[in-house]
Amino acid sequence: MTDSVIRIKRYYYIHILDNNTNVTRTISGPVVYTRQEHETCLFDPRPCVSVPPRHYCVVKNPCVRNEAGEVVLESSGQVKLRLGDAEIRFEGEPFPLYPGEELDSKEEQSVRKLQVIPPNTGLHVRCVRDFKDAERLVVAGTEWMVAGPQSYIPRVEVAVVEEVKATVIYPNTALLLQANVNFTDRRGVLRVAGEKWLVRTLGAYLPSVEETVVSLIQGTMLSELKALRLSAVRSFTDVYGKARRAGEQWQVTLKDAPVHIVDAYETKVAEVAAVSLNAKEYVIIHHPVDATGHNRFGETLVRRGECTFFLQPEETMPRGVEQVLVVGKEEALLLEAVCEYHDGGGKHQPGSRWMVRGPCEYIPANEVKLLEHRRVMALDRNEGIYVMNTTTGEVRAVIGKPYMLDSNEVLWEKHLPLAIEELLESPNGSIKTCERNAGFVSRREKYRIVRFNVQHNAAVQIYDYRTKKPRIVLGPSLVMLAPHEEFTVLSLSGGTPKVPNSMQSLQLFLGPRFSSDTIVVETSDHARLRLRLSYNWYFDIDRANPSQRTFSVPDFIGDCCKTIASRVRGAVAAEDFDSFHRNSAKIIRIAVFGVDEVGEAKKNLRFNANDFVVTNIDVQSAEPTDEKTRDSLQKSVQLAIEITTKSQEAAARHGNELKNQEAKGHLERQKLIDKIEVENARTKWLELQAKSEAVQASGQSIAEAKARAEALLIEVQSEMQQAEMRAKAYRISAEAELQKLQQRQALELEYTQRQNEIDVAKARAAAEAEAEKVRRMVDAIGRDTLVAIARAGPEAQVKLLGSLGLKGYLITDGNSPVNLFDAAHGMIGEPKK
């Protein structure tokens, strides 16, 4: 400011710099200040700092004041400052800032409101430098809580760490606290750093600076069906006054408290639901707790309803709640004693087994182990199972009746080779080697008896390796294997040409059947031919007593084909190609079947080793194996066919020409006949034309008269025909009506006759019934009784009249008939019933 005269209002101030001494001083208004030449006004008049009520400000580098409150000046006249320090000033008279003093502006506010601490709130403060308060020395680092409600008076030596709100503790809740340092809490309990405890007092709780709120713990509501399982973190005494060891587990139930709040050194393991059992339920508890509260590990306890209980710690129910075993009439339980056991039936040693048969209810005991719940196995007439006696090791088959395993019996599984299993599941017990399934898995129940349906006209050989004897079953039949029996598997040749082991089969087809084979032969002139042969065969066996030699040749197809091929090759080798080609069937038949005494070919070929008979052989094809020979043969055949075809064409052409010549001769002759007929027809036409001209000359009147006469004749004939048709129709209608009337009358007559017969039969039956009724009544009442009843009325009336002294009287005329039957009734006045 350059003005020499400065007007300073009230509560305003300026700083004047003395340029000679370099000292700055403060001048407060109201005053008019005349600036000297060596003085400089540093700024325009500024308002003094005004702190309203409930406010404060922070002055940095405050000036030093003496005990009287006056500003202390240095020797140079400069205001003495506490550099680096700060001073908090509250409400009062406005004051100027001396040179060097500064207002601490926080959030652009130099004057701030005093902080109000509401209820249930506190300020966590920390001493940043030592100071003395109410004769008490507060050292740096000390922390404390300023609780509300109040206004917080700040100090430069104290810093606010945070605002802390109280935690409200509701019913069934508690506050978990942890000590930060060693201290004595509000209840006078000494706490060490890291210790945890619960505050259960209801209401708002404001923690001290030595405490940390860990969490607010909700209580667990307990009921008759709900308990709380706890575990001790360390050894302590719980809220119920019981000493707990570290790691110990226990349960709190409704008997202890309706609500439980997990303590600081307790851990909630789980909420345990009560186990409720009805009269038909039970549980097996493992590791039960004894009366002292300790688990008996390795033991079990059976509890049966009706009851409700909680599982104690370490107790388990691996199988859960189980229904009481209801053993039916056709059921049983296989039991085994795990230790010495006494029941109503006697004493059982450990390891002994016995059966409990139904009907009954059974609950396993601790000393007994339930091995199996057995039922009667219903078996049809063609079903069975294998049963093994565990005592003797004997295996037997049970077939066709319901069976219950005994205590020393088990189902025995009969294992068969995988190849036989696959054959059993094939439709006819046969399968080709190329069709086998490498991943085949048998679905047969091993303990079920092995069954196989032998087809019609087939046989199966079964070998008992215990008795070393085979047996043969002829079809149709159902084979059931005994425990020590096995199937005889046939491995047959197949394909064309035959390949060994191409097919496996459980049954031997007895035939008649046929087989085909391809063989290569060579004639005497070294012509190689491929023959395709087919032959019929069957097994000649005695069905009443089949022989075991039928199965003596495992591959009878292969042996038969080899034998036939050998004979055919030998026979063909003795013939040249032309001779064999002309007589192939005869040569092969004689070679295979042979000849009898008279030189004729036999009818069959018999293999005595297995009673195998070949009845017929057929050559399906014969062709050279050499390609050139085959082509030459085909060319010769084609040439022969062409020659035959050409000769047939020439004969047909000659016959056709002969027929054409004959047809031409017939045609010429017919033309001449037609000309003669035409001339005759022309002659007749000329004659008719002449007659026509004569008729025309006779005049038109004759023609018209003839036409009218013919028309009249036609009309009369038409009317006559119509009259005949009407008469015929009337006659047909009358006959139909008459026939209809006759049929109706016949039906009515038949109906009337049947109705009369029914009425007569009904009347006869009613009369017979009435007569029978009367007869039975008479028989029931008796003859003497009827006579007495008939006489009782008249006798009584006579006696009555006699007692009155009347002899009787009657007045009548000759025209009125007299009925004296009821005269007595009329006289005595008795009503007629």
Curated annotation (Swiss-Prot):
The residues bearing each MVP repeat, given as ranges, are: 10-52, 54-115, 119-170, 171-223, 224-278, 280-328, 329-380, 381-433
- Where is this protein found? Cytoplasm; Nucleus
Which terms in the GO cellular component ontology are assigned? cytoplasm; nucleus; ribonucleoprotein complex
Check the record and name the InterPro entries matching this protein: Band_7/SPFH_dom_sf, MVP, MVP_rep_dom, MVP_rep_sf, MVP_shoulder, Vault_2, Vault_2_sf, Vault_3
One Pfam family linked to the record: Vault
Q: Which residues form the signal peptide?
A: none
Major site of localization recorded for this protein: cytoplasm
Which keywords does this Swiss-Prot/TrEMBL entry list? Answer: Cytoplasm, Nucleus, Phosphoprotein, Repeat, Ribonucleoprotein
Q: Which domain of life is it from?
A: Eukaryota
Tell me the function of this protein: Required for normal vault structure. Vaults are multi-subunit structures that may act as scaffolds for proteins involved in signal transduction. Vaults may also play a role in nucleo-cytoplasmic transport.
Q: How does it associate, per the subunit comment?
A: The vault ribonucleoprotein particle is a huge (400 A x 670 A) cage structure of 12.9 MDa. It consists of a dimer of half-vaults, with each half-vault comprising 39 identical major vault protein (MVP) chains, PARP4 and one or more vault RNAs (vRNAs).
What is the protein name stated in its UniProt record?
A: Major vault protein
Organism equals Leishmania braziliensis
